[in-house]
Amino acid sequence: MTKRNIVDLPEDLVMEILARVPTVTLVRLQSTSKRWNVLIEDKRFAEQHFTNAPRHSLLIMLMTFRVYLVSVDLHTIHNNKVNIISQLRLKDPLSNFLEEVDICNVFHCDGFLLCTTVDNRLVVSNPCSRDTKWIQPRNFYKKFDIFALGKSSCNKYKIMRMDQFYPDRPEFMNYEIYDFNSNSWRVVGKITDWFIPRCMDRGMSVNGNTYWLASTNKDLTSSSFLLGFDFSTERFVRVSLPGDHLSDPVFALAVTREDPKICVAIIQELHIDVWIATTIESTGAASWSKFLSVELANLYERICLDSWMNFLVDQKNKVLVYRDGNYWISNVFLHVVGEDKCIQVDHHDSVSRCSLVVNYVPTLVHI
């Protein structure tokens, strides 16, 4: 029987094979064949690949205003280092020299990244397909705007922006929606009875919707609640939190890495309890399951956890992954913490600091 090279196979069969190859591997293969490159750039193939390819979670890290795609070993205790796979290079369209823009925040949904720049601009990018779309404002963006990237039940992607119009009254805000189909903004409503503290303004995206910790007053411990935004109805809903809250704990939000679910860490003086939302109804009713409890006294290093901490939950390995919060120069970038483990993950560059870590599932789908 004659052996056949994959490039000689019928196109339908090649599509079927490549649609099951992990995204990052497929991107590396693009340069090996012009035929494959054309195929991988095709929107029909991207949709087929999104449905069939295995989902391998990586991390997005924001370091010194640059966005990196990285992988992390959750098991190695000694000499564990961040493995940088690639860098997202966003060229400034307003610069004659195509300088890179400085990124100050990143939001993630379905492999797309919504980035805010230091000079208050907004851009959506897919690091794998290399698509980039600059989002023009209805009027202008402001430093303390709150953004979220999501999608409706019919898979229409949208951006939600909260605009604080009284600087000294954070509970008074307009909110508006950018629709990718119409490429335009429209004002949807006003907010007057709650606010999202600036230290918690980066929401968590799960199944197309976004969640924050919000408050009805400035006493964040006694009045915090979970707030969700439904991109289908374009409305906010309060979601019930787990626990009895009798001791005024500090809350922090996270997302599971594998099958995305919203998580809440309840931070007490001596321990941390992590809960996973198994279901969230449109009414805000939620069912929670306790995932992990970590006794801080059992760890060899005291860990500083706050309501503005940025962390992820890995269900398979039963650990938390969070960025180092120290303000002094250090090689330590991440901590991996479980019931019986505490691992430090280093980076070779001790000058850089990680200001954000986001779970990322690569996709070839175009913006």
From Swiss-Prot:
It comes from the Eukaryota. Residues 3-53 form the F-box domain. PROSITE patterns: FBOX (PS50181). Signal peptide: none annotated. Pfam families: F-box, FBA_1. InterPro entries: F-box-assoc_dom_typ1, F-box-assoc_interact_dom, F-box-like_dom_sf, F-box_dom, SCF_F-box_component. NCBIfam families: F_box_assoc_1. This is Putative F-box protein At4g10190. The lineage of its organism: Eukaryota, Viridiplantae, Streptophyta, Embryophyta, Tracheophyta.
